[in-house]
Amino acid sequence: MAVELAGPFAEVLRAAAIGPASRLCCALSGGVDSVVTLDLLTRLQPRFGFTLTAVHVHHGLSPHADAWAQFCARLCAARGLTLAIRRVEVPTDTGQGLESAARARRHAELVALPCDWLVFGHHQDDQAETVLFRLFRGSGLRGLGAMAAVEPGQHAMPGKLRPLLDIGRAGIVAYARAAGLEWIEDESNADCRFTRNALRHKVLPVVQAQFPAVAPTLARTAALLREGADLLDDLARLDENACGGPVLAADVFASLPAARAANLLRWQTARMGARAPSRARLGETLRQLREAPGPLRLPLGDLWCCAYQGRVWLERDDEAPLRAHLWCGESSLGWGAGQVRLSQGGGGAALRVAAGEAMLAPPAPGLRMRLGPGRPTRSFKNLCQEAGIPPWLRPRLPVLWVAGEPAWIGGIGIAAQFQCAEGEQGVVPAWVPASAAQQGQHLGQFDR
């Protein structure tokens, strides 16, 4: 029995290129699925050479929660493994419901762990439940594709491995019994007030009576849907390139069929690690982009969809407070959730200023500046318009002030009287917004 599960389990590890440099962390609830996962990881560790730890998330929702944490601690101690116990408080006022809120808190704890891969005990029956749950919720292709056995990490978060995803729960229990393993039973798994439990105990048995192979069939359907979702991602990449990159040329974007435009914005949203917008919100955003010339800043899930001067892009809010700084020679200064970098350089791209002379602060009313010899002095509004900086970002632009005069404005440039001459050394300022890859791309060169 051990060999039967070790073979497919090892295939998933090989597919993820797991080796001696890999740091794996097993998500250990104490249930049979996670206990079997930990056992197989322990058996396969000498073959693959990976570093193995475990984590238990203590929700505090059950009177047995402390006992479960102690069980997991004993299990890991017997195997010489380090166990991290993460205690979380599950909010009850989020509107998500207890089941979803607990899952969200658990996920937030797990993805913050210092490892390369999180390893879960999800199995084929879990996959079937997930497909049905998301079908009834009205998910799209990516959601209906459910879980993948190998899910590479994104946004500096660890990847996810599910080596038992093609194994049914019955096979996992049989393995555990044959191997003499012990596990705990979570009484909440029998509570059909929770949607997934209702699917497991009430819906799937009825379907299985008519279609005995429902679990592997739904797993196969999920794999096909993931392939379709991957193809839509490829199409989004092609459409983004045709539109000129992450900051889209508005005229080219407007020429896309509505379904492809929506697909592109969904893909960009996912790439930024944000919550997917609702179908209705996405449709309304596309309608306004088509009908209004801009400037526009429209809510889109966790992000904002912006349109200005013939460009369309997604950005996050930077709500961090702006604090004035006296520059005393530091290589960088914080600015909101971003920063201003200051490096040594020369020529017209450098600023003639000494440490202790410049104050980093927001724009002030009546700000005017001349960008180069022979050029007129322009108002702050005119400078922003010429640089393509939209109205909602202007109050948060960083300005270096010297003796009450604006010497440099982030995204715009250096005032003529503070520019270094050819061969003269000075300081080169560069503004890096909160999310330079998304929020700041429409500003062009940050080092202006």
Swiss-Prot record:
Catalyses which reaction(s): cytidine(34) in tRNA(Ile2) + L-lysine + ATP = lysidine(34) in tRNA(Ile2) + AMP + diphosphate + H(+)
GO BP field: tRNA modification
Species whose genome carries this gene: Azoarcus sp. (strain BH72)
SUPFAM superfamilies registered for this protein in UniProt: Adenine nucleotide alpha hydrolases-like (SSF52402), MesJ substrate recognition domain-like (SSF82829), PheT/TilS domain (SSF56037)
Predominant location category: cytoplasm
InterPro entries membership: Lysidine-tRNA-synth_C, Rossmann-like_a/b/a_fold, TilS/TtcA_N, tRNA_Ile_lys_synt, tRNA_Ile_lys_synt_N, tRNA_Ile_lys_synt_subst-bd
Record keywords, A-Z: ATP-binding, Cytoplasm, Ligase, Nucleotide-binding, tRNA processing
Function according to Swiss-Prot or TrEMBL: Ligates lysine onto the cytidine present at position 34 of the AUA codon-specific tRNA(Ile) that contains the anticodon CAU, in an ATP-dependent manner. Cytidine is converted to lysidine, thus changing the amino acid specificity of the tRNA from methionine to isoleucine.
Pfam families: ATP_bind_3 (PF01171), TilS (PF09179), TilS_C (PF11734)
Annotated compartments: Cytoplasm
Disulphide bonds in the chain: none
Enzyme Commission number, as recorded: 6.3.4.19
SMART domains assigned: TilS_C
Domain notes: The N-terminal region contains the highly conserved SGGXDS motif, predicted to be a P-loop motif involved in ATP binding.
UniProt binding sites for ATP: 29-34
Protein name, UniProt field: tRNA(Ile)-lysidine synthase
Top-rank taxon: Bacteria
One GO MF term: tRNA(Ile)-lysidine synthase activity
Gene Ontology cellular component list: cytoplasm
Keyword Nucleotidyltransferase on entry: no
Family under the similarity heading: Belongs to the tRNA(Ile)-lysidine synthase family.
